[in-house]
From Swiss-Prot:
This is Protein turtle homolog B. Gene3D superfamilies: Immunoglobulins (2.60.40.10). It comes from Homo sapiens. The gene is IGSF9B. Pfam families: fn3, Ig_2, Ig_3. Belongs to the immunoglobulin superfamily. Turtle family.
Amino acid sequence: MIWYVATFIASVIGTRGLAAEGAHGLREEPEFVTARAGESVVLRCDVIHPVTGQPPPYVVEWFKFGVPIPIFIKFGYYPPHVDPEYAGRASLHDKASLRLEQVRSEDQGWYECKVLMLDQQYDTFHNGSWVHLTINAPPTFTETPPQYIEAKEGGSITMTCTAFGNPKPIVTWLKEGTLLGASGKYQVSDGSLTVTSVSREDRGAYTCRAYSIQGEAVHTTHLLVQGPPFIVSPPENITVNISQDALLTCRAEAYPGNLTYTWYWQDENVYFQNDLKLRVRILIDGTLIIFRVKPEDSGKYTCVPSNSLGRSPSASAYLTVQYPARVLNMPPVIYVPVGIHGYIRCPVDAEPPATVVKWNKDGRPLQVEKNLGWTLMEDGSIRIEEATEEALGTYTCVPYNTLGTMGQSAPARLVLKDPPYFTVLPGWEYRQEAGRELLIPCAAAGDPFPVITWRKVGKPSRSKHSALPSGSLQFRALSKEDHGEWECVATNVVTSITASTHLTVIGTSPHAPGSVRVQVSMTTANVSWEPGYDGGYEQTFSVWMKRAQFGPHDWLSLPVPPGPSWLLVDTLEPETAYQFSVLAQNKLGTSAFSEVVTVNTLAFPITTPEPLVLVTPPRCLIANRTQQGVLLSWLPPANHSFPIDRYIMEFRVAERWELLDDGIPGTEGEFFAKDLSQDTWYEFRVLAVMQDLISEPSNIAGVSSTDIFPQPDLTEDGLARPVLAGIVATICFLAAAILFSTLAACFVNKQRKRKLKRKKDPPLSITHCRKSLESPLSSGKVSPESIRTLRAPSESSDDQGQPAAKRMLSPTREKELSLYKKTKRAISSKKYSVAKAEAEAEATTPIELISRGPDGRFVMDPAEMEPSLKSRRIEGFPFAEETDMYPEFRQSDEENEDPLVPTSVAALKSQLTPLSSSQESYLPPPAYSPRFQPRGLEGPGGLEGRLQATGQARPPAPRPFHHGQYYGYLSSSSPGEVEPPPFYVPEVGSPLSSVMSSPPLPTEGPFGHPTIPEENGENASNSTLPLTQTPTGGRSPEPWGRPEFPFGGLETPAMMFPHQLPPCDVPESLQPKAGLPRGLPPTSLQVPAAYPGILSLEAPKGWAGKSPGRGPVPAPPAAKWQDRPMQPLVSQGQLRHTSQGMGIPVLPYPEPAEPGAHGGPSTFGLDTRWYEPQPRPRPSPRQARRAEPSLHQVVLQPSRLSPLTQSPLSSRTGSPELAARARPRPGLLQQAEMSEITLQPPAAVSFSRKSTPSTGSPSQSSRSGSPSYRPAMGFTTLATGYPSPPPGPAPAGPGDSLDVFGQTPSPRRTGEELLRPETPPPTLPTSGKLQRDRPAPATSPPERALSKL
């Protein structure tokens, strides 16, 4: 326990002792603090208080070493005491530390901190702590020279620059940016610069630079040197033209700068020249201006600046005044010597010099070259070898230079004079001792008397000599200088003559050598010379030499051995300047020294190390495998001292490099390696050779020789042969294509021309006449074309193969034929589009000739119909064109078949009249509607129902107009009915379908229908005979089945014809009565008392049965067709071309209606209200027209579905669906189920022909239609082409080869060959069967039908 108490007491005592020592502030180790100028720093000082008790009060004092009083005192809460140097920058930090802000370089030093405890005693020595503060600062100058300092020229100047910084900076001097070091001119020591022997070159800016790691400081001082002026910009030579102002500049600098400038002309002040002082001015900057210069102002001008210090400098320049050439002081008389050469001079003054001098003699230009012995000199003078009297005259000269001329000279008269001559000549040589007297004679005479003068050749003599009045030269005492060549000159106005002599002075020292030459090397010099006159005694030579930089007393004499005139001097220093001279001597003395020659010996060749030649290896070696080898390419070395001489190419396959080529030119950058082994890996590298050095190898490029094939041959221009062959082949193909196209075009044109020659049918068209009060028929005028209609068909010369009797064509027909040719050629060349063809057809191509009556309605006059029944066909429409809608027309035309014309159609040929020039054409044919749907055969009831469903059937009630909605023959209007308006054809687009109106068929036709009453010369019934029927069927796909009616699917009437029975047996009960058409009630045969002039063309008659939409019509029994022989098949509704070019529609004959099927007169029944005329002689058309005045013109009224007034089928409501039919194949003939019939057009309509009217028989051929009129065909609604006849044997009998018209099908013609049928056409009885072997009955078919009924 006691031990623990003692230990506690000891620890307390120890603690108190430590506290006492801390309070007393025992000294600690000094602290070092570093700061940068401008920063803040804390000088640390700690205070230790007792462990127990309250801290006693204390005072903090900070001292700086070297400052006697504290710089900072702090006690308690009282404000501190701060030294003024630290005011605002010193403060107490923590308890006793000192904080200094913005420290400066002056703050650097030792600082002491003292803490005084007020309640304790302390030891002064042991109390306090020391801190050393180091301030790092950039250099700053404490002493610098002034910005400008002056120094006199020739004196010296010292400039001192002192800098302070931490660390201590280094001070250097620079002049104009160049560092100055210790030299003879400048001395640099501890920041001071001393310049000795100050000159003008020492002036300028001097810079003092003090720098350390903390930064640098720079001070600049300008040294001004006092002295005379220095010309900075001297004047320069100038050239001005006359009357311009001259400007000479002169700028000088000096310190002080009180400069004055003085100008001199030819060493005389410009202000002292009378003519110049009024035209000059000196500016303050020293510039001299001379106004309106004259030629006399040319010369040297000198500028002298001055500032009253020292000697003034000067600078000179020359002024050149340019002016046109002029003549000065032309003498009025020019003397030319006689017998010797003379000159005619022109005193020219020009700047620049004269280039041309032109002479005039006696007012005329002088041709100098034309005078023998005359020469024009370069200065413009004329040299005359020997003057004669021809040279006499008055001369003027006109000089020219680049500026022109001032005019010609004053006139000068040429006078011939004798030249002066010597009366006494001096001797060749005179020898006399020096000091003696000598007289050399010389005398001359002439007119005028010459003046004699003497002169020494070369250097003038300064000895005492004179020329006597007699002309002699007198030497009173000869001297050494008199030695030499002398000349005696006699001169007058004519010319000057000379005489020479040589004077030798004996007894003198040698003359000086001449022509000294020195050839030097590095240590030797070879001196040579030409000796002078020896003075009459033997002379010797010596060579004198010295270094050029030595003084005049350092000459060294080298004796020359007697004889030679050269000396080799050796032991010379290389690259040193030496001076040489030669001295001659004899016994009387020495000569003068020759001229001094200064030369420099050559320097020893400095042995320099061989220059380092840097050759880098070639770059970017690339190996490209080609079909023939390997193409190696590279770039030249990046660095090379000299051009590359060549390249070396190496390769390796294994480990060893082998040489491939070592002679590749240095300008190349590619190499082609050939003849390589197959399937081998190659590595290549390239080296550059420059002089004798070889560079390092380039990078290694590897490539395999696999798949290397021979490269295709290249042409000289670099193209591969396949490419060239392709180009040539393409060119040849194009050339061949062009050639074949040209040949094809020529062939087509030739064929077209042959076809045009073969086809002579004119364009047949349906036109309407322009408004006219009378037609050609009504007016009684018969054109030449109308004669054709009166001829019989058998009279045609074309069809008979005989030469055609060409007749004179009317202008109208010629115009139509030209239009026909142009349109045909355009369409046949396939250049017409459909729209273009339609437009052209509308403008130029008529469809059918129709005469317009006085009331504006279209008229077909039956009065002109010829009653011939031999041929019953309508001439073909040659303008029918096969299009996408109607291909059968072109095919039918191309078939070139010429079937025989039925007798019912042949009667219409003679009633056609030619076109009139006042007629216009209808629109082109309608577009084909793809909505056409072939339908099955229906009965009359079905057709009637369909027409009623589509709105085409007329009600039984009477209508205001008999024409209804279709074309038809109208009966005479009853008194109570309103006259229908005339029909005018509007100009519309392409119609939908074509409608062809037909008159009643003749009674003697083969189909059992009555003929037109006018042809038999009998009156007609007043009843209406409907002649139109719209069947409902289409083409049957079976060749031997019952054909469908293609006309049944149209909502337009299309082709309106009477029905036709198929060629099969009909039950007796179903056959019509005699005299009545089949399928019609007997009430339809009411014959009127008189035949009407206008007949109504009724709507088509339908079958009595279901409508098309209610069910198909059953096909006829096949047994009815089995007993018929194989005949060409023609589908119903087809338009077949005949030999006349007309499309013949194939119409079905309806099944016979049962009795009572129609309860009365039906509008849709076939109305046969024709009276049966009695056989009687047929009058001619004109006789019939005169015999029956009640016959009127047949007028066509517009139908509701007229192709010229209606819209397309697709836009009509209630239209049956139409479907596109398949394109028929030309040449295939099907067995006809029913006979065909052609309708006879009105008499007012004519079909023109290209040649004379055709009068051939029905069996004869005619040309097919013109292709140019095919697009305008109006009957292409439902027409189809003919199929080709099936293969089989030729017909054996007359009836085997007959078609349904009783005609023999004509094969295709070749050239102009026309085939004729062997047998006449058969007739078709009322039963519908062909009678081939039996003769034709005497009675007409209508009579047989009526008798049977």
